């Protein structure tokens, strides 16, 4: 009988110790309770209720770079162009970031590529290659407005390559 109490006490001690979560700097832990969003914990030590709460995501708030590698686009004069870009962003709202889409970086990449293709399809190939700054600014405005709904702050979208195929 005493062994049962010792085992039970050991389980309680281990569960209690495992329930304290230390969140590092520039990181947010997203916690779900009973399968739905409960809270987001910032830097510091937090208590997670055993068997009820679950840390479902550990999100970095540090600035991140997302490459957009060698995609194709067609200009208004039906010339194929190859483009590569770099997207710099940071997470501003962990709840929106973790709950809005299944894979937010992939959605951001897809949205950026679609915006580039839309802008490039409206101009000729020569104009597209000459006016890369204008294209970047137009795409940046479109993408940053949409990315705010996903809890992201897009700080820069830079074309690294725009050339004829």
Give each language-model segment a name:
Residues 1-3, 104-105:
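Structural motif marking the loop-to-transmembrane transition
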Residues 2-20:
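Single-pass alpha-helical transmembrane signal-anchor segments
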Residues 3, 37-41, 97:
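Sequence-level detector for tyrosine residue identity
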Residues 7, 40, 134-138:
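Short, compositionally biased strand/turn segments
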Residues 23, 31-34, 52-165:
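Amphipathic, interface-forming alpha-helical segments with heptad-repeat character
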Residues 28-48:
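Membrane-cytosol interface motif
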């Amino acid at each position: 009988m005493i062994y049962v109490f010792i085992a039970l006490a050991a389980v309680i001690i281990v569960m209690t110790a495992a329930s304290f979560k230390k969140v590092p700097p520039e990181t947010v832990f997203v916690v779900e309770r009973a399968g739905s969003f409960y809270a987001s914990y910032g830097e510091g030590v937090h208590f997670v209720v055993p068997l009820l709460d679950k840390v479902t995501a550990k999100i970095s708030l540090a600035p991140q770079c997302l490459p957009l590698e060698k995609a194709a686009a067609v200009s208004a004069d039906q010339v194929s162009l190859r483009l590569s870009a770099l997207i710099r962003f940071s997470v501003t709202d962990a709840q929106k970031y973790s709950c809005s889409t299944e894979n937010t970086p992939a959605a951001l990449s897809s949205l950026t590529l679609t915006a580039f293709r839309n802008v490039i399809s409206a101009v000729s190939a020569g104009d597209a290659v000459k006016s890369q700054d204008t294209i970047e600014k137009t795409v940046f405005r479109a993408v940053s407005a949409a990315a705010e709904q996903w809890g992201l702050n897009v700080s820069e979208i830079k074309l690294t390559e725009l050339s004829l195929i």
